[in-house]
A protein has these predicted regions:
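Short hydrophobic beta-strand segments in globular cytosolic domains
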Residues: 87, 160-161
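Acyl-donor-binding surface of acyltransferase catalytic domains
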Residues: 1-35
Length: 170
C-alpha cells in the first residue's frame, strides 16, 4: 500500500448567478430519472466508473444499505444512454434544511469518456436542480477523478470555496 497526496475541491454556484440553461443533447442521447429507485443501477455505476478513480467507500455496503440509500426521498439518480446503451449517471440530493442541491456522484463509463458526455450530464444536473429553486448547487471532486472533472465544473460557473490535501492509501 502506498500513500498519495490527493487534492480535494469543493465547488459551488449560487443559483441567482445562473441564467437560462439550454440543454441540447446530441442525437440518440437521452437522460432519464430512475423512477424505480433501483439501487442496482447506483451500485453498477459506482463500481464500473469508480474503479478507475478509487471510489471505494461504498464497496463495503450491503444490498440493504444500497437500497436505503437509493430510496432516500431527496435523492435522484439520472441515467444517460446512447440509444439503449448505458453511458453514465449522476446522483443529486436536495438538502431542504440548507436549501441546496448536492451533486453526489457523476461519471461516464470508460468507453464514452473524452466525448463531452460529462458536460451534458453537468448541464442536465444544473437544469434539473433549478426545479427545486435552491439557493446554491455544490459538488466536490478530487485529483483522483477524471482529468476533465474540475475544468468541467469551472466551465459551468462553479467556483472553489474550499480546498484540502489529504493522504490517501491506495
Amino acid at each position: 500500500m502506498r500513500s498519495l497526496k490527493v487534492y480535494r475541491y469543493f465547488l459551488v454556484i449560487k443559483t441567482k448567478d445562473l441564467g437560462i440553461v439550454n440543454l441540447k443533447l446530441p442525437p440518440k442521447i437521452s437522460i432519464t430519472k430512475d423512477k424505480l429507485r433501483d439501487f442496482n443501477i447506483n451500485k453498477f455505476f459506482y463500481k464500473q466508473i469508480g474503479i478507475d478513480h478509487y471510489w471505494r467507500d461504498r464497496l463495503i455496503w450491503s444490498d440493504k444499505t444500497w437500497s436505503k440509500y437509493a430510496l432516500n426521498k431527496n435523492l435522484e439518480t439520472w441515467i444517460m444512454k446512447s440509444g439503449k446503451e448505458l453511458v453514465g449517471f449522476y446522483e443529486q440530493e436536495y438538502h431542504p434544511s440548507k436549501d441546496e442541491m448536492e451533486l453526489i456522484n457523476m461519471g461516464i463509463l470508460k468507453n464514452y469518456r473524452g466525448k463531452k458526455f460529462g458536460s451534458y450530464l453537468l448541464e442536465h444536473f444544473i437544469k434539473e436542480s433549478l426545479k427545486y429553486k435552491p439557493k446554491r448547487l455544490w459538488v466536490h471532486t478530487c485529483s483522483l477523478d477524471h482529468k476533465y472533472a474540475l475544468p468541467n465544473y469551472k466551465s459551468k460557473g462553479f467556483n472553489i470555496f474550499k480546498e484540502e490535501v489529504i493522504d490517501f492509501n491506495t
